[in-house]
Curated annotation (Swiss-Prot):
This is Thiol peroxidase. Disulfide bonds join C59-C93. The active site is at C59 (cysteine sulfenic acid (-soh) intermediate). NCBIfam families: PRK00522.1 (NF001808). CDD domains: PRX_Atyp2cys. It comes from Vibrio cholerae serotype O1 (strain ATCC 39315 / El Tor Inaba N16961). PROSITE patterns: THIOREDOXIN_2, TPX. Contains two disulfide bonds. The lineage of its organism: Bacteria, Pseudomonadati, Pseudomonadota, Gammaproteobacteria, Vibrionales.
Length: 164
């Protein structure tokens, strides 16, 4: 499977989850440096926004757009996942007044990108995650999955929100 980065093909590996699948299990590092897993979000809908780094324009914009769109939804968690250290993600949220977001890093578990089918195998971003959004209902069943074809493009916000 491939995506593009600045119109250059980049191979990705792993199995990208599809609508109707169960959300794969995961263990990530939270902002407080403690582990986060599927169990922490039981009974909640999850919008999992996966991206290369919070310090890129498209990644930061997508976090802000999704946070604003989901602000009043008490039944939904916005889980932002990247290789960034928790300190960088916390700094971003403080500097940009981003709240109601759960930041998670896969820096301790690089296998996360394989398990979720977003592992960038080559190019300048090798080892980071491709841009993707996966939405799961309160039972852990995927209701939306989007692997963004061009890493520098934003996800389809309307389809994300319609899947909730």
């Amino acid at each position: 499977m491939t995506v593009t980065f600045q119109n250059n093909p980049v191979s990705i590996s792993g199995s990208f989850p599809k609508v109707g699948d169960r959300l794969p299990s995961f263990t990530l590092c939270g902002a407080d440096l403690n582990d986060l897993s599927n169990e922490d979000f039981k009974g909640k809908k999850i919008v999992m926004s996966i991206f290369p780094s919070i310090d890129t324009p498209v990644c930061s914009k997508s976090v802000k757009v999704l946070q604003n769109a989901l602000m009043t939804r008490n039944d939904t968690v916005l889980l932002c996942v990247s290789a960034d250290l928790p300190f960088a993600m916390s700094r971003f949220c403080t500097e940009h007044a981003v709240a109601n977001v759960t930041n998670a890093s896969f820096f301790r578990e690089p296998a996360f990108t394989e398990r979720f089918g977003v592992n960038l195998n080559e190019g300048a971003l090798r080892g980071l995650a491709a841009r993707a959004v996966i939405v799961a209902d309160e039972f852990g069943v995927i209701t939306h999955s989007e692997l963004v074809n061009e890493i520098t493009n934003e996800p389809d916000y309307d389809r994300i929100l319609m899947s909730l």
